[in-house]
């Protein structure tokens, strides 16, 4: 329930409270006034009794004493009624205070529940944003690893369509250069799990790479650093595995 609803319901419940309090206070004032009137009457009766004690007969004395006793009895009744009204007024106010405390407790519980829901939503939203940023970083890393020049293309071993770089004179093409990227830099980059790997190190394409001139080479592309090259060799070049196979033949 919204705070406005709690406040509205509480204000509705105490709408008649001022009138009820005013009525009880007015009744207590009336009782006070009636008690004061009786006290004045008692004083007069007592004065009459004392002043005329010697001249009054026994019956007259008993009559005055009876009137004084009845007046005191009335005062006691008025006092009891006043106490009852005071207790009723206290309970009336206390009831509204307890209801206010209950409504406040419910309102605080609702606030905590909404804060928890808001925290869960912010957490899931933050995770979604982090996931989106991670995906963007992966795409950016792949774009960086493929080089700055649009005409430079990474090798694709799946269909062997991009055997663009061979060191042999038969193809006469220079090796593809992907920029000055070191293996440690690539290892720190986010990697797409679907991106193919190459070389003896089974890493993605980066830096300068060279293709094996054996058309049946299972790996096909190698990083310069992994095969001990610093520059492109002249003539045909075979990877270490293919070189060993050729020596066996």
UniProtKB/Swiss-Prot annotation:
InterPro entries: ING_fam, ING_N_histone-binding, Zinc_finger_PHD-type_CS, Znf_FYVE_PHD, Znf_PHD, Znf_PHD-finger, Znf_RING/FYVE/PHD. It is found in: Nucleus. A zinc finger (PHD-type) spans 196-245. GO terms for cellular component: nucleus. SMART domains: ING, PHD. The record marks 198, 209, 213, 221 as: Histone H3K4me3 binding. One of its GO terms (molecular function) is methylated histone binding. Belongs to the ING family. This is Inhibitor of growth protein 4.
